[in-house]
Amino acid sequence: MRLRSKKWAVPFIDEHPDLIIKDQRAKQLKGSWSSVFGNNHPLYLEIGSGKGQFILDNAIKYPENNFIGLELQPTAVAIAGKKAFKQEPQLANLKLILGDGGDVSDYFADNEISKIFLNHSDPWPKAKHEKRRLTAENFLKSYSKILLPNGSLELKTDNLGLFEYSLSSFKKFGLSWPEEQISYDLHHELKKNPVNIETEYEKKFAEMNQPEYWIRVNF
């Protein structure tokens, strides 16, 4: 969902380059993210991080890991940045990239990422837009490059069509998963993902008793 532009967003982004990293600089940091964080802790990436609540909650809960939220909309990135700055002390394990997730290998080197999160991605329901879906083959090829061996991807969506398309796409790509790593109603099967952190959309859909589809696949 595209947010209404906020006049303060771009100035805020410009004022906080240590937290919010713009596209060109992020590309220059490819392969060097450990130096950005000052350690070699596992690096987790959310593609399409929106207003940032999910990636922020992860960074708070898991200080032993590093987290990056990749988002195209400046207003969304700025809102996420404001949330991060409200944390005391400041989160040293969180960065935001203002950039396009069309090819994540532009930003990350081979085997640089431990896990990728896709949360409530645009389903792009029209057949002519298939290649824009974040679980299409062209995206999976990029993910397979940047993920560590046996690195994982977690997908959560309320859109059954996108979920079933993703399952088919994963299988065609040669991926498989055990029964305990897939759910057609996650909130009633939390034993499969007991450390689940809800997204903003997920909370809304749960209140409407709408099922949350979830899968974790290893590359």
Curated annotation (Swiss-Prot):
It catalyses: guanosine(46) in tRNA + S-adenosyl-L-methionine = N(7)-methylguanosine(46) in tRNA + S-adenosyl-L-homocysteine. Residues 128-133 are annotated as: Interaction with RNA. GO terms for cellular component: tRNA methyltransferase complex. It comes from the Bacteria. Its EC number is 2.1.1.33. Pfam families: Methyltransf_4 (PF02390). SUPFAM superfamilies: S-adenosyl-L-methionine-dependent methyltransferases (SSF53335). Catalyzes the formation of N(7)-methylguanine at position 46 (m7G46) in tRNA. This is tRNA (guanine-N(7)-)-methyltransferase.
